[in-house]
Design a protein with these regions (language model features):
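Short regulatory "switch" loops immediately downstream of catalytic or recognition motifs
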Residues: 104-113, 236-237, 358
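Intrinsically disordered, low-complexity terminal tails and inter-domain linkers enriched
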Residues: 110-171
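Residue-level detector of short coil/turn "hinge" positions at structural boundaries
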Residues: 57, 131, 152, 279-280, ...
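Disulfide-stabilized, aromatic/cysteine-rich ligand-recognition loop
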Residues: 1-32, 36-43, 47-61, 65-98, ...
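A conserved hydrophobic secondary-structure block that centers on an alpha-helix together
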Residues: 174-175
Length: 488
């Protein structure tokens, strides 16, 4: 646990090791000033590891309101009385010191469950919702990489004390299998990805070093695979670090469908552009066409054409667009229009998860496409090792049982599904992570689900059941898509 906390803190400090002026500036109304994110992860850690577990007073009073994502939207946070860069770093050190002192009280705790957990995700035919005795309760955590969820909503605490004051059993549930530490670790990884999105949006020369060269791709023609009809297990009831919206595991019957083995490439998006896809209203939904006209979009965000060459801006550097990488920085409406142009559609999130996890031989769902072991650099492109997507075909050992590749890492993948609760959903430990984003009865979801994580996602903060969500207009996120179709 200590190693996990230290690893993600290194990421946070690395992405904020820049001039103070850059830290306090609001680079886009879509994002917070980086100094807000920095102090916010400390406030979240203070809330859960110091106050909730240790029943201690707040490390510093007067900060909960300022760093409450529900009370203050991103566009307004620069006007708050934020801690300055030096103050934010000092606050993080103070909180971490107290959290580690308290950790010693609770004895040995498990490491990231991805390294040791065997997850029995098989559901015998005839079983509906899985509610195994002794399963760890749901674990919501921090702000989603896309910026929709929040880890510290106002309703999570009425004062600057513990959010668990009224629940005598909640303390023990937080410690079960160490999941409160997993919650904090994942939350900070999610904010690290948010910080990278802010860096991508800022203007000016580069501030971040370029990551390692990604694994080489291989020539893989566009191919689709048939996923047979039948039941599979959607979600999880066993994973101790899973958020509440991933729970509970339940049996889902799906008809057969085809899905591409690879995400859509930059080359394919260029073909869509050259075919007039951005200018043909027949390819767009009414809401999508309205967005396209208002935005004036003619290509993915950060792209432009110079003569016959497509260029992009990546963290302040100008470079040609690599044709064989997965396309990223496209919104859901762009993905939907491309799919319609290609005579295809986006997969539902249930289809995506079945293609990613279901093993027809064992009739169980895996934690990752390749199995239950934690991702390595041979499996997937994660953790900002490369500063961007890897070429398609770079990770054959990360393929799922059906042969789909790049299902984890590289780009978040838009799905056709709105963000709704699973049958038997129970919010825990508070409503503001997921429940408040679900549609009210009789309404449709304003959000679309994304799956799989990106090259910027921390390893502890992704698994095949992970559900991200955002508005269909979002482009600053590291998102792409893959195509599917009904089986004839």
């Amino acid at each position: 646990m200590v190693a996990g906390l230290e690893e993600v803190r290194r990421r946070s400090l690395l992405y904020t090791d820049i001039d103070d002026d850059e830290l306090v500036r609001q680079h886009s109304p879509l994002m917070s000033p980086l100094v807000w994110d920095l102090a916010h992860v400390g406030n979240f850690e203070d809330l859960w590891l110091v106050r909730a577990l240790g029943a201690q007073d707040a490390t510093r009073s007067g900060l909960d309101d300022i760093y409450d994502a529900f009370r203050h939207g991103r566009a307004s946070r620069a006007a708050l009385a934020l801690l300055g860069p030096a103050g934010a770093r000092a606050y993080l050190r103070e909180v971490r010191g107290r959290a580690l002192d308290l950790l010693d009280r609770f004895g040995p705790l498990p490491d990231d469950p991805a390294h040791s957990l065997t997850i029995p995700h098989a559901l015998p035919v005839g079983i509906g919702i899985a509610t195994e005795p002794g399963a760890a309760p749901p674990v919501p955590a921090g702000t989603s990489p896309t910026g929709t969820g929040t880890p510290s909503g106002a309703a999570a605490r009425a004062t600057e004390g513990s959010p668990l004051d009224a629940d005598a059993d909640a303390h023990d549930r937080l410690l079960t299998r160490g999941f409160v530490y997993g919650m904090v670790i994942q939350h900070e990884h999610q904010h690290a990805e948010t910080m990278l999105a802010t860096h991508q949006l800022r203007a000016g020369p580069p501030l971040l070093d370029v990551g390692a060269t990604p694994a080489p791709g291989r020539v893989v023609p566009r191919r689709e695979v048939l996923v047979p009809a039948g039941p599979f297990t959607l979600g999880t009831s066993h994973d101790p670090w899973a958020y509440d919206n991933e729970r509970p595991a339940h049996r889902v019957e799906l008809p057969a469908f085809w899905i591409d083995t690879l995400p859509v490439s930059n080359r394919a998006q260029m073909a869509f552009i050259d075919a007039g896809g951005y200018d043909d209203p027949r390819l767009w939904s009414p809401a999508g066409w309205e967005w396209r006209q208002q935005e004036g979009a003619h290509a993915p965000a950060f792209w432009w054409r110079d003569g016959g060459i497509w260029l992009r801006r990546r963290f302040g550097r100008i470079e040609p667009v690599p044709p064989d990488e997965p396309v990223q920085h496209v919104c859901w409406y762009e993905a939907e229009a491309h799919a319609r142009w290609a005579g295809r559609r986006l997969p539902t999130e249930a289809e995506w998860e079945k293609a990613a996890t279901h093993d027809p031989v064992t009739r169980r769902s895996r934690r990752y496409p390749w199995g239950d072991t934690a991702p390595t650099p041979d499996h997937a492109n994660l953790g900002n090792r490369t500063s961007g997507p890897a070429p398609l075909g770079a990770y054959p050992t990360g393929a799922s049982p059906c042969g789909a590749e790049h299902m984890i890492g590289d780009v978040w993948e838009w799905t056709a599904s709105g963000f709704t609760p699973y049958p038997g959903f129970r919010s825990h430990p508070y409503r503001e992570y997921s429940e408040v984003f679900f549609p009210k009865s009789g309404e449709t979801s304003a959000f679309r689900v994304l799956r799989g994580g990106s090259w910027a996602t921390g390893v502890p903060a992704i698994r095949a059941t992970f559900r991200n969500w955002d508005y269909p207009i979002r482009r600053q996120i590291f998102a792409g898509f893959r195509l599917a179709r009904d089986a004839e």
